């Protein structure tokens, strides 16, 4: 599910910006037949995170990490251009890991609405009608041509999860001014199912005042 090209681009932008963290994880797995440990890795930026088996980390992303950090970390570390590497306290790393583990509890399923507005924000909607927008650059972390991941949003709407087998991508949604909330809901209320079947989805729909939207996320590059 994780796009090699997309992840490398996001890592590069994060490294030049606010930095990112690399958190190796050893998880104990127990079954009736046997018990073993499996190695996972978490990559965590300001508004995104990726989690997968270490062996499934895209090769070029591993190369990018080695280039940025200077080596492949075996312990949690944060890295940023022109700054010394910061070793992460074990307690802090454990908290971040557990927070990601708990996000799925009480989460709701989302479906994509085929609208990209202002050339940047992809809309998703839950079964209860709540609508969220995600930066299309961060969505490039996911190879949607290869898989159709399960999409979920936390109960408070502060983090989305895209899940496929042992791979996970976490994204913070954007936030917009109250004035535009009704317009977002109007877009979501359109009969998208029939429009898609008729091969007539709306793309780059712009009902927003350029001076009024207030994105929560900052550009990664």
Predicted regions, residues:
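Generic structural signal for alpha-helix starts
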Residues: 54-55, 135
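Generic structural signal of hydrophobic/aromatic residues within well-ordered alpha-helices
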Residues: 7-11, 62, 184
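C-terminal functional regions that serve as terminal interaction/effector modules
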Residues: 45-48, 63-221
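Anionic-ligand-binding alpha/beta catalytic cores of soluble enzymes and soluble regulatory domains
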Residues: 55-57, 62-64
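Intrinsically disordered, low-complexity linker/loop segments enriched in Gly/Pro
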Residues: 1-52
């Amino acid at each position: 599910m994780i796009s090699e090209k997309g992840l490398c681009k996001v890592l590069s932008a994060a490294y030049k910006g606010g930095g990112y963290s690399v958190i190796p994880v050893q998880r104990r797995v127990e079954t009736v037949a046997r018990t073993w440990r499996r190695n996972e890795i978490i990559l965590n930026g300001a508004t995104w995170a990726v989690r997968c088996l270490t062996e499934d980390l895209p090769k070029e992303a591993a190369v990018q990490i080695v280039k940025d950090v200077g080596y492949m970390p075996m312990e949690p570390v944060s890295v940023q251009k022109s700054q010394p590497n910061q070793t992460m306290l074990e307690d802090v790393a454990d908290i971040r890991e557990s927070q990601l583990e708990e996000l799925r509890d009480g989460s709701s399923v989302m479906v994509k609405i085929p609208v990209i507005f202002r050339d940047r924000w992809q809309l998703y909607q839950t079964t209860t009608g709540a609508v969220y927008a995600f930066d299309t650059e961060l969505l490039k972390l996911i190879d949607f041509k290869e898989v159709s991941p399960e999409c979920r949003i936390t109960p408070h709407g502060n983090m989305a999860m895209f899940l496929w087998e042992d791979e996970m991508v976490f994204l913070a949604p954007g936030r917009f001014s109250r004035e535009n909330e009704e317009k977002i809901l109007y877009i979501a209320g359109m009969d998208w199912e029939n429009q898609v079947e008729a091969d007539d989805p709306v793309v780059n729909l712009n009902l927003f005042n350029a001076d009024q939207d207030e994105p929560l996320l900052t550009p990664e590059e």
